[in-house]
A protein has these predicted regions:
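DNA-binding alpha-helical recognition surfaces that contact promoter or target DNA
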Residues: 35, 94, 98, 140, ...
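C-terminal structural cap/anchor segments
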Residues: 63-64, 82-89
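Catalytic-site neighborhood detector that most strongly recognizes the C-terminal catalytic loop/helix
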Residues: 50-54, 89-92, 155-180
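Short, polar N-cap/turn motifs at the start of nucleic acid-interacting alpha helices
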Residues: 39-45, 146-166
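Basic, Lys/Arg- and aromatic-enriched nucleic-acid-binding interface segment
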Residues: 1-30, 34, 88-91
Length: 183
């Protein structure tokens, strides 16, 4: 939906869309995303060393670039040094919410109310952040190939990461397919 959204009248949103969609295709932390340059693209792969990973566990992450991610990069080939024309993180997060609202992405999500520690339902466009891209990357891959080690190798998570386990949602369709495998 987002990749093909017509944002011709909103160039600011078009840039946010491109950054967010690219982010959903590569799944890195936003800090790593902002550090990327053209030098991080090698033979159709995005290659980088995660910044937040503990030094003793640090290893290079290689993510094959989807055709749509490559097309987004083509739009910004003349960007100055950086891979994409990044905005300050708070502007990026506000832009993501504005983009989702503009595109009518209003799926209700359950979040934890930090004041009363109760769960509340809110439209995605009110709560989405750059982290939503990382979660989307892991969730989409996990629905296709539920192999935590393979996915973690592309998201930069270390084995046994609690954060990684939170991203993996097992939906009803996955459960249905699993039951159908039983003879």
């Amino acid at each position: 939906i987002l990749y093909n959204a017509n944002l011709g009248g909103c160039p600011k949103l078009a840039v946010i869309r491109d950054i967010f969609v690219f982010h959903c295709y590569v799944g890195c932390r936003v800090g790593d995303l902002y550090r990327l340059t053209r030098d991080n693209i090698k033979d159709g792969f995005l290659e980088y060393m995660p910044q937040k990973t503990k030094k003793c566990q640090a290893k290079t992450v290689r993510v094959p670039l989807h055709e749509k991610a490559l097309k987004i990069l083509e739009r910004y080939e003349s960007s100055t040094g950086k891979l994409l024309p990044f905005k300050p993180i708070h502007q990026y997060n506000l832009g993501i919410r504005e983009l989702l609202k503009h595109c009518g992405i209003d799926r209700m999500v359950t979040i934890l109310d930090t004041h009363g520690y109760n769960t509340v339902q809110k439209p995605l466009y009110e709560v989405a952040t750059s982290h939503t891209a990382r979660k989307t990357f892991v969730g989409n891959l996990y629905k296709q190939v539920p192999d935590p080690n393979l996915i973690a190798s592309m998201s930069g998570h270390v084995e046994g990461s609690r954060a990684f386990n939170r991203y993996r949602t097992i939906d009803d369709e996955m459960k249905r397919k699993l039951v159908e495998m039983i003879n």
